[in-house]
């Protein structure tokens, strides 16, 4: 059962961030520029996935709660092999009949940790969010057919480092599918569990997609958003595991009869 907590909070003012180089300090605007139903709220939620596992989901518009979850994700990433340090990312948009469309919800996933950040309900950006999205070395963001997502994020004042981003649809194909544009559900059903073939049918695309601006988000949309980010993360992890395993097998096969290679 989810428990929501919310309170009204005023927008934060612009502030100067110091620069140790002695140059003029940058003016940083922490206010979220996207119009919407502003509400400071947090909904923690356990979301069931296949094999009776649970996702630990935090849906929030509160910058401190978002920062806490981002720090937890960074800690998880720090304990991983560098090859597998990735963050699953997905974006939901404002209504297409009210242009210009912008990002309304940003979802991030690392293992079972999921952040569903409700941008249009927020008044202030989390301090950890932009540094996370612009990280240059430590991890890679993984999305699915995400060119549009990146554009909507940029319109909303956020940008993912283009040098640390992978579009999974351009890196993998579902065997025997044959279609040029394959879906996330098809990827997830092939790589994770067959039940994900129906994952996009859990909500009414016409009616429920108009509710992303409602604060707080209803639980069914939180679950939908969390699973999108999770299957993106999990599918890419399996792809990377297979690619790494095949690469190591090729190397091992080339040295199969070499006792010095195996250390005996």
Language model regions located:
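Generic macromolecular interface patches on structured domains
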Residues: 198, 242-245
């Amino acid at each position: 059962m989810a428990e929501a907590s919310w309170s009204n909070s005023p927008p934060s003012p612009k502030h100067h961030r110091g620069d140790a180089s002695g140059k003029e300090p940058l003016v940083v605007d922490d206010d979220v520029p996207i119009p919407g139903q502003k509400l400071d709220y947090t909904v923690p939620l356990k979301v069931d996935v296949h094999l009776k596992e649970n996702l630990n989901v935090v849906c929030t518009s509160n910058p401190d709660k978002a920062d806490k979850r981002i720090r937890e994700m960074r800690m998880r990433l720090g304990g991983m092999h560098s090859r597998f340090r990735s963050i699953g990312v997905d974006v939901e948009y404002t209504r297409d009949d009210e242009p210009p469309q912008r990002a309304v919800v940003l979802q991030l996933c690392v293992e079972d940790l999921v952040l569903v950040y409700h941008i249009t309900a927020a008044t202030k950006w989390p301090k950890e969010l932009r540094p996370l999205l612009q990280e240059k070395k430590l991890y890679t963001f993984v999305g699915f057919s995400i060119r549009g997502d990146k554009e909507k994020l940029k319109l909303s004042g956020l940008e993912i480092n283009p040098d640390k981003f992978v579009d999974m649809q351009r890196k993998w194909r579902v065997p025997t599918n044959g279609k040029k544009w394959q879906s996330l559900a098809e990827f997830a059903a092939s790589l994770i569990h067959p039940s994900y073939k129906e994952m996009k049918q859990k909500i009414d695309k016409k009616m429920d997609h108009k509710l992303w601006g409602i604060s707080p988000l209803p639980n069914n949309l939180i679950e939908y958003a969390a699973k999108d980010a999770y299957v993106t993360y999990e599918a890419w992890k399996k792809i990377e595991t297979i690619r790494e395993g095949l690469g190591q097998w090729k190397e091992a096969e080339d040295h199969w009869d070499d006792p010095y290679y195996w250390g005996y």
